[in-house]
C-alpha cells in the first residue's frame, strides 16, 4: 500500500506542467566556526589588584586623596564663607584674620582630612561608594568649582573692598 501511494505521487507529479512545479532551493555550504578558549566557561574572573593601603600612596601627587580632600574642604569652606557673609557681613579675608575663623579652619581641615583618609587606608577605592546621584566624578567637579568659588570670593573682596554679599 505504501508503495502504491509513493508511485501515485510520482505519477501525479509527472503530469503537472513544468512551470507550476516548485523546486527546493539548493543547499549551500554551511560553515562551521570554531573558537578556541584558554579558560573554561566557568573560570573565575582574574583577581583585581587591591588598592594600596599606604599613606604615601594615598597622598601621592596622582593619588586618590589630595584632590578629593582639597575639594571637600573647598566645598565646606565655600558654603560656610557665604553663610557667614550673609549672616554677619564679614568678608572672606576678615573671616580668615579672626582667631575664631582660624580655629574653625584648623579643626575642619583635621576632621575632614582624617575622615577622607580612613576609608582609603582600609583599601576602599574612591569610586567604591558611588550612588545614583553623587558619584566620584561629580564630587571632583564640585570640588573644583568650589575651589574656583573661594578664589572668586577672595578676588571680589580684594578688588571691590567689600564682601561678595553686601548686607
UniProtKB/Swiss-Prot annotation:
Its main location: plastid. Residues 1-33 form a transit peptide. The keyword rRNA processing does not apply. GO terms for cellular component: chloroplast membrane. Keywords: Chloroplast, Membrane, Plastid, Transit peptide, Transmembrane, Transmembrane helix. InterPro entries: Chloroa_b-bind. Induction: By light. It comes from the Eukaryota. It is a multi-pass membrane protein. Pfam families: Chloroa_b-bind. It is found in: Plastid, Chloroplast membrane. The chain crosses the membrane at residues 101-121, 145-165. Belongs to the ELIP/psbS family. Probably involved in the integration of pigments into the mature pigment-protein complexes. PANTHER family: UPF0041 BRAIN PROTEIN 44-RELATED. This is Low molecular mass early light-inducible protein HV60, chloroplastic. It comes from Hordeum vulgare.
Amino acid at each position: 500500500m505504501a508503495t502504491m501511494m509513493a508511485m501515485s505521487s510520482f505519477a501525479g507529479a509527472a503530469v503537472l506542467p513544468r512551470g507550476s512545479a516548485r523546486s527546493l532551493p539548493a543547499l549551500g555550504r554551511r560553515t562551521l566556526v570554531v573558537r578556541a578558549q584558554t579558560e573554561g566557561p566557568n573560570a573565575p574572573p582574574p583577581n583585581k589588584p587591591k588598592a594600596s593601603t599606604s599613606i604615601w600612596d594615598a597622598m601621592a601627587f596622582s593619588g586618590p586623596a589630595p584632590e578629593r580632600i582639597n575639594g571637600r574642604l573647598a566645598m565646606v569652606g565655600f558654603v560656610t564663607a557665604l553663610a557667614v557673609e550673609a549672616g554677619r557681613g564679614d568678608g572672606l579675608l576678615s573671616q580668615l584674620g579672626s582667631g575664631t575663623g582660624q580655629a574653625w579652619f584648623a579643626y575642619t581641615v583635621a576632621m575632614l582630612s582624617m575622615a577622607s583618609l580612613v576609608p582609603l587606608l582600609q583599601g576602599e577605592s574612591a569610586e567604591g561608594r558611588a550612588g545614583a546621584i553623587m558619584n566620584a566624578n561629580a564630587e571632583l567637579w564640585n570640588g573644583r568649582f568650589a575651589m574656583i568659588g573661594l578664589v572668586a570670593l577672595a578676588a571680589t573682596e580684594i578688588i571691590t573692598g567689600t564682601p561678595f554679599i553686601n548686607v
